[in-house]
């Protein structure tokens, strides 16, 4: 995230002018903007103007007898600057665009005060965000977004015969770089030659997509994952092509490839990749890896010593009241609640846990680990000491 200008006080009002430079930045912006904030940006809007002819309400016959000409309305798309009071935010991760709907609060000749408008925030387009309260969560989110060292850490080619998807695991988003699908014929008898030809073409398409989407100046590790031997076949093809065509990005980073077995080539198998020990070791100091480890620690504790782990808002709150939380795991979706009081409640809760010496991990709902946490209410904790009576409290 490029921060162009900032003018705010901690736990007070202010504004930040910024520009999203990649998909991760848009995701952070989505988590940063909430109800009662305002956003100013250049936008486009269709505006109408009357033509020379008059009243559109008259029919052709009425116009004939009344001696009046029919009117028509011309519309044109104009570029203007608007500021909207945020009511709704939508993030389209596939299109790399964020839509912010709200009422206009900026005087403009084309759009009246109070009229609804939807701003579209895209990559490389500056915008200004105003908040009445830059709380600790907002400041942490802004800091993470502008941390250049925390870009896409991991590239994953998730595949099976005839299907390959490329994912980039970054600060908190897994964005699909490409999806390649090919119908592979059966490998038997006279059809073997056709099978080999189609498979080679499929692999070549995956190579091209990999070269297009994976930048080793940013990515620390590239994983090729599949069931069976597809990953091995593709890895061999990739290295042979790199030698034949002198593909320097591949040749210079051969040691950064890891092969991982998964149960399928579909997105849900990403969690298998992230839990692989070799992958964890390569990205052990990144935010994503730390979150995966924290979640693994929670499940291990819940399995081996269930009195030292809990989940659900009520149980976690009671655990904190007793100063028992060692590690808090919470999903970012809880902070996007349309009710400002609910959002503030969770922000204050996180701050309170930190103040009492607890460690806090805020999971992205778009990460595989975040999806797992969401299945357990989106909030969980590892405890400093056992609380066996928690199970008697209704969740």
Swiss-Prot record:
SMART domains tied to this protein: eRF1_1
Q: Does the keyword Transmembrane helix apply?
A: no
* Localization of this protein: Cytoplasm; Nucleus
Q: What is this protein called?
A: Protein PELOTA 2
Organism, by scientific name, is Arabidopsis thaliana (Mouse-ear cress)
Write the record's keywords in alphabetical order, separated by commas: Cytoplasm, Metal-binding, Nucleus
Q: Which PANTHER family match?
A: PELOTA, PROTEIN PELOTA HOMOLOG
Lineage of producing organism: Eukaryota, Viridiplantae, Streptophyta, Embryophyta, Tracheophyta
Main location class: cytoplasm
Family indicated by similarity? Belongs to the eukaryotic release factor 1 family. Pelota subfamily.
Q: Name one GO cellular component term.
A: nucleus
The record describes the protein's role as:
Component of the Pelota-HBS1L complex, a complex that recognizes stalled ribosomes and triggers the No-Go Decay (NGD) pathway. In the Pelota-HBS1L complex, pelo recognizes ribosomes stalled at the 3' end of an mRNA and engages stalled ribosomes by destabilizing mRNA in the mRNA channel. Following ribosome-binding, the Pelota-HBS1L complex promotes the disassembly of stalled ribosomes, followed by degradation of damaged mRNAs as part of the NGD pathway.
A UniProt-annotated Pfam family: eRF1_2
Molecular-function GO terms, alphabetical: metal ion binding
Q: Metal-binding: present as a keyword of the record? A: yes
Tell me one GO biological process term: nuclear-transcribed mRNA catabolic process, non-stop decay
Cofactors (names):
a divalent metal cation
